[in-house]
């Protein structure tokens, strides 16, 4: 699938995307380089316009995922007591609406990313791992909660990142 087609398809509803494939599956695509700079610039402008037109289901990162220092300090103190090897539902209280199925889905996804990072990063000590977990939670709060990203039955939220990417940013995209 080419860049232009992918750009168009991610904005289809879940129902419309089922028509492309036998079942709906989230899309995770990466493109490295392009043969046509003009097409790339057109697609990037289209993506930016789509994100601006759909702020409740979209977030766009341009070259980095900034970390809000104030939130990091606020959450840092609250999260000092968590077990960074396994997050519980009570550890993320208030991240999503009370009773929302998203809370458990987020905890499951966060634990998946923590396990993945533990296997690949070999954190030298517990504090470094805990800071990694805090960063994932602060980023989620900053870009999902504060932007009021909607999760509903018909439209899947979109997350677009372009530019050089760090390992932690990759883990965050996996988490989403």
Residues of each region from the PLM?
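Active-site and donor-binding regions of nucleotide-sugar-utilizing enzymes
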Residues: 108, 118-175
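Ligand-binding pocket scaffold of soluble enzyme catalytic domains
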Residues: 16
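Conserved N-terminal ligand/cofactor-binding loop architecture of enzyme catalytic domains
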Residues: 1-12, 20-137
